[in-house]
Amino acid sequence: MDYTNNQLHIIYGDATLGVNGKDFQYIFSYERGGLESLKVHGKEWLYRVPTPTFWRATTDNDRGSGFNLKAAQWLGADMFTKCTDIHLKVDRHDFAELPIAPFNNKFSNHEYAKSAEISFTYQTLTTPATNAKIIYNIDDVGHIKVTMRYYGKKGLPPLPVIGIRLIMPTAATGFDYEGLSGETYPDRMAGAKEGKFHIDGLPVTEYLVPQENGMHMQTKKLTINRETTQNNVDRTNEKFSLSIQQAEKPFNFSCLPYTAEELENATHIEELPLVRRTVLVIAGAVRGVGGIDSWGTDVESAYHINPELDHEFSFILN
C-alpha cells in the first residue's frame, strides 16, 4: 500500500492494535501489556515489550551503605510487571472498552486516522503498591511520543531509578548522542562537557564486581545503530538506526548489552553472559552513585529519588 497522505492505517486485531504507515509498523498487545513490535524500514527493534524499570545494578557504595537491602522491593517490581488497565484513543474517539473480539468485527481493513494514543497502567509489586503508566502517542508520520508517569505513594522504599527499559533483538554496533561527555550521574556531572559523541559497541565498565555503569545524563538526542537482525533471511549487514529525541526536557539513558539483573547476578566480570542484545534504559530520575568515604556513606539526599512524589518524563521515538 502506498501511504501518500500521512494517515495511519489502524488495524483492530482480536488482541492487538496495529498502527501502520510508510516504512513503519507498530503492534500493541493487550495481552502482553505494551508495544510488542516496532518495525522501521522492515527492521524489528523490540525483543520484548518495553516495561517500567525501577532497578539498577547495585554499586559498591550501595552495598556498603545497605541501600540494596532498603530498596530490595524494587528489584521484584523491576523483574515482574502487572498491567492493570489499557486505554485507547484514535483521533477524537475515546474507546470506553478495548476493541477486542468480537467487538472489532465492526471495523474493516480500511480504517485510517491522523493520530492514536494508547496507555498501559502497571501496578508495582511492592508493599504498598503504586502505579506507573506508559503512554504512546503516535502522530501521522509515525513518530511516537512516549510518556511515563510514576505515581508516588507514602511508605515505599527509596528508588534506584525511574525509567523505561527497551530490549532490542541484537547487539548494537554503537550509538551516537548529543548531551554530556562520558559517563554521568546526578552527582557526577561537574566535569562533563556538552557536545556530540560517538560510542563504538556497547562498552561495559570492567569493575571487579559488575555494577551499575554507563549512564548519560541530560541528553537531547540518541541514535542507536545495528547491523544484524534475528531474521535468518536478512543477510544485508548494512547499518540501520533508531533515533530517540527529547520531548519537553532532556532525558537520561544507558545503552548496555546486559539488564540490571544480569549485572547484579555476576560476581566477577568474566561471569557475564555473551553479548546478544541491546538493553536501552530511558530514565526520568536517576539516583546518585555517592562514594563520599570508603564506599559506605549514603548518597547525599539531594541525589535521592523520593518514592512519595509523582515523576513524569517523555521522549520521542522516530
Curated annotation (Swiss-Prot):
Its EC number is 3.2.1.23. It comes from the Bacteria. GO terms for molecular function: beta-galactosidase activity; carbohydrate binding. The keyword Mitochondrion does not apply. This is Beta-galactosidase small subunit. Heterodimer of a large (LacL) and a small subunit (LacM). PANTHER family: BETA-GALACTOSIDASE. SUPFAM superfamilies: Galactose mutarotase-like (SSF74650). Component of a beta-galactosidase. Belongs to the bacterial beta-galactosidase small subunit family. Pfam families: Bgal_small_N. Gene3D superfamilies: 2.70.98.10. It comes from Lactobacillus helveticus (Lactobacillus suntoryeus). Induction: By lactose. Part of an operon consisting of lacL, lacM, and galE. GO terms for cellular component: beta-galactosidase complex.
